Swiss-Prot record:
Residues in the signal sequence: none
One matching Pfam family: HMG_box
Disulphide bond pairs: none
Protein name (Swiss-Prot/TrEMBL): Sex-determining region Y protein
The entry's keywords: Activator, Calmodulin-binding, Cytoplasm, Differentiation, DNA-binding, Nucleus, Sexual differentiation, Transcription, Transcription regulation
Molecular-function GO term, any one: DNA-binding transcription activator activity, RNA polymerase II-specific
Gene name, Swiss-Prot/TrEMBL: SRY
Family designation: Belongs to the SRY family.
GO terms, biological process: cell differentiation; male sex determination; positive regulation of gene expression; positive regulation of transcription by RNA polymerase II; sex differentiation
Known function: Transcriptional regulator that controls a genetic switch in male development. It is necessary and sufficient for initiating male sex determination by directing the development of supporting cell precursors (pre-Sertoli cells) as Sertoli rather than granulosa cells. Involved in different aspects of gene regulation including promoter activation or repression. Binds to the DNA consensus sequence 5'-[AT]AACAA[AT]-3'. SRY HMG box recognizes DNA by partial intercalation in the minor groove and promotes DNA bending. Also involved in pre-mRNA splicing.
SUPFAM superfamilies registered for this protein in UniProt: HMG-box
Subunit architecture: Interacts with CALM, EP300, HDAC3, KPNB1, ZNF208 isoform KRAB-O, PARP1, SLC9A3R2 and WT1. The interaction with EP300 modulates its DNA-binding activity. The interaction with KPNB1 is sensitive to dissociation by Ran in the GTP-bound form. Interaction with PARP1 impaired its DNA-binding activity.
Region (Disordered): 121-143, 184-203
Amino acid sequence: MLRVLSSDEHREAVQQQNILAVEGTSCELCTESPTSNYRCETRGKGRDRGQDRVKRPMNAFMVWSRDQRRKVALENPQTQNSEISKQLGYQWKMLTQAEKWPFFEEAQRLQALHREKYPGYRYRPRRKARPEKSDKLPPADASSTLCSQLHAGERLYAFPYKDGCTKAAHSGMKDQLYSSSEPMSITSSLLEPGPHRTSTTLQDSPEDLAMQLSADAPLYRTLELGVSEAYFAW
């Protein structure tokens, strides 16, 4: 007798058929394709490729130091390998040519065997990984902007000098002008010439400033009129 399947049972049967079909196609791909089959069988064996790397034949120093290194390591077990290499290098230099000659002959024999075993061998040194530079240089626009601001400040606060004042007095006033940040603080620094220094604050009235300027007028004749009007205009 035939059984009528419900909608849920029919849906489950279709899903199972789809799963079986996907598994069958994946197995066929692994068996039919030689490259995929090689990947399936040799998965995880990529690290073993480094073991097949052909080593260089030993030279005379390596032939001599092979036994000497063992002796030094047994006599000094706490010595590091780098220190042992330094000692062996110094001892090798102290040997005469007659003492080195047997090791040169052995090295030539090993090189001949190496050429016979690996006729197409070529030495390929491993390249060291370059460290990534994390520090980034500042953009060139920042330095050029800073220089332009400095030049602009020099043009703004530069003023000439005459015979009435010395260069030292003007250089001192220039330093005071550069160290100030507000116009009123600049005027207060200018109103302190040295021996007869007066105290000027932001609370002083325009009349007091005018009186002080009239009293100190001989010392500040060299200041330009445009600068004084720009700083003392209310």
